[in-house]
């Protein structure tokens, strides 16, 4: 074979090739290919004429002996043929060589998964949200109550409940914000508020919190009133540095387009140039898909460390940051950006962003015979302004139902070989704070004993298959885990076809080193379990669904919850967790 042929082979196939020719099978893929290429270049021994002396006479003698009868009608040749056949069959059935396609025989037993129970969990979790804004934001009483709920559920299942708490940087929305525009009547002398303003013809436009605008991650506070006439600078799509430099002391207005300037970049530019605030407008994401023709405002986080660095070592506390819908942005542009006499602005954002708040990590544990551990997790916090039914209530409910099923298996089967652990994380939406703090605290134990971390973040598929698709992707950073997942998925397709056949189940192996194109991206709670184990690369699997157009908006509600879709990843990954719990060779 050529090197190109070997490059197209899987590592498992390369190892089978090496094993079949008696060469070592250890090492990276590049080393395996190099070993095979070196072997293919070895000279082949060819017989020369001297080796053929008296060959014809020897063949005649051998053939004569092979025809000699030894048992009834059987001659020596027939006996040898029978013995060789028996030997080959024995090799196949007993030894099962890898070069014939045989591998380790794993006992995959699909776990049960009650999708109706996941909906019960989801409804109970959503009910714990903020009374007005509906979210379970990290560092709030809503998140604390969510953690207690999860601990209670795990305890009832028979797990040893353990609660961890961490003080981390976190912003907090203290009260309902206000964002209004005023075009003064009476030749500009009429007040904006009160009966005199109404008589004088002043027109006040009120933007609705959560629907027309949302506060962004780590936003600072503001109390800009109508009479301050705070100026606005049009920053286009936010990519021109000169415009940012010209916007000192003003509200910067950014139209989000294909350039997709991140929140961290915008907020950092604002801090470096002393802006009075930022207003970004969604002009591109999910437009006309979830609310008429509008582009709904989306909550996004900001990288804390990058922002602090841009601001000279502290968090900027006096730069409010909001995101608007396209329709609301059009109104703002008409009344402020493009108006001959710009409307006055009231922007009251009551937040605290320079303090630490307590976030929680509830866990349930069933001890195994060995020190090795398998952990499954999901983040229980949501954005502040929405239920988060998909992100990530769907993941938490999957984890709880898996935990319930695994507890029942342990009750019937006995102590597992590996420790089984289920955890949920606070602080994910603002920077993976909970999972990172937990990994840092458990650093030594996890580095030495973590077999696998299983992550569930938006492992949900919207029920509108026709318009939103029906795919979900199971992905991992380890080839062995990838093989297990595919084999279990094949079994799932055979035994649970009534659900499996509805979904496009995809697979992805992302085993590149950090920074490479095929790396596991660091955008969910599996990140610290892979990259923050003191130099060791951890192993993780995760699942991502599809069709979540309402992501990070006030419309991510139970109206779109499709509990059936959780059955796929919950059963496949739960089955793998079961295998790892009881088979130390897996």
Which functions belong to the PLM regions below?
Residues 1-49:
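Basic helix-extension-helix modules of the SAP/HeH family
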Residues 1-2, 38, 43-104:
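Secretory targeting signatures
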Residues 120-251, 258:
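Noncatalytic luminal/extracellular "stalk/propeptide" segments of secretory-pathway proteins
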Residues 216-240, 307-389, 404, 408-414:
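Soluble metallo-hydrolase cores and metallopeptidase-like ectodomains found primarily
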């Amino acid at each position: 074979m050529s090197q190109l042929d070997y490059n197209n082979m899987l590592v498992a196939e390369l190892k089978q090739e090496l094993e079949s020719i008696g060469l070592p099978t250890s090492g990276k893929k590049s080393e395996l290919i190099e070993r095979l290429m070196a072997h293919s270049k070895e000279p082949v021994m060819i017989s020369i004429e001297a080796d053929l002396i008296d060959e014809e006479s020897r063949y005649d003698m051998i053939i004569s002996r092979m025809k000699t009868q030894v048992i009834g009608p059987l001659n020596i040749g027939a006996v040898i043929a029978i013995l060789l056949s028996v030997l080959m069959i024995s090799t196949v059935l007993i030894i099962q060589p890898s070069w014939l396609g045989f591998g380790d025989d794993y006992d995959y037993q699909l776990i049960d998964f009650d999708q109706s129970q996941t909906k019960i969990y989801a409804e109970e979790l959503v009910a714990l949200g903020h009374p007005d804004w509906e979210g379970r934001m990290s560092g709030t009483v809503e998140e604390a109550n969510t953690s207690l709920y999860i601990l209670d559920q795990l305890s009832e299942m028979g797990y040893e409940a353990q609660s961890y708490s961490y003080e981390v940087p976190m912003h907090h929305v203290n009260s309902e914000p206000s964002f209004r525009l005023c075009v003064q009547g009476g030749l500009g002398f009429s007040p904006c508020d009160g009966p005199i303003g109404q008589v004088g013809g002043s027109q006040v436009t009120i933007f609705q919190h959560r629907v027309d605008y949302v506060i962004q991650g780590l936003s600072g506070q503001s109390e800009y009133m109508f009479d301050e006439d705070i100026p606005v600078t049009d920053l286009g799509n936010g990519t021109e540095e000169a415009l940012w430099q010209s916007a000192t002391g003003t509200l910067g207005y950014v139209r989000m387009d294909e350039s997709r300037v991140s929140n961290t970049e915008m907020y950092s530019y604002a801090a470096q140039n002393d802006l009075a605030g930022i207003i970004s407008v969604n002009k591109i994401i999910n437009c006309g898909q979830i609310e008429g023709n509008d582009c709904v405002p989306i909550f996004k986080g900001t990288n804390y460390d990058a922002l602090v660095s841009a601001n000279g070592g502290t968090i900027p506390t006096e730069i409010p940051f909001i995101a608007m819908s396209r329709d609301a942005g059009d109104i703002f542009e008409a009344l402020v950006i493009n108006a001959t006499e710009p409307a006055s602005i009231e922007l009251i954002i009551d937040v605290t962003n320079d303090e630490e708040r307590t976030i929680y990590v509830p866990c349930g544990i069933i001890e195994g015979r060995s020190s090795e551990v398998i952990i499954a997790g999901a983040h229980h916090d949501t954005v502040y302004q929405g239920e988060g039914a998909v992100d990530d209530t769907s993941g938490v409910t999957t984890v709880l139902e898996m935990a319930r099923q695994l507890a029942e298996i342990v009750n019937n089967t006995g102590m597992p070989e590996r420790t089984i652990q289920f955890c949920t994380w606070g602080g994910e939406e603002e920077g993976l704070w909970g999972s990172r703090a937990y990994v840092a605290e458990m650093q030594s134990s996890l580095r030495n004993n973590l077999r696998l971390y299983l992550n569930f973040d938006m492992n949900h598929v919207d029920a509108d298959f026709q318009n939103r698709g029906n795919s979900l992707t199971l992905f991992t950073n380890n080839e062995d885990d990838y093989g297990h997942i595919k084999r279990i998925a094949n079994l799932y397709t055979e035994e649970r076809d009534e659900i499996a056949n509805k979904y496009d189940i995809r697979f992805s192996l992302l085993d590149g080193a950090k920074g490479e194109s095929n790396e596991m991206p660091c955008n969910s709670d599996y990140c610290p379990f892979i990259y923050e184990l003191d130099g060791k690369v951890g192993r993780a699997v995760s699942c991502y669904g599809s069709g979540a157009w309402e992501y990070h908006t006030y419309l991510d509600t139970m109206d779109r919850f499709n509990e059936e879709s959780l059955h796929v990843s919950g059963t496949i990954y739960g089955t793998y967790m079961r295998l790892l719990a009881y088979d130390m060779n897996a």
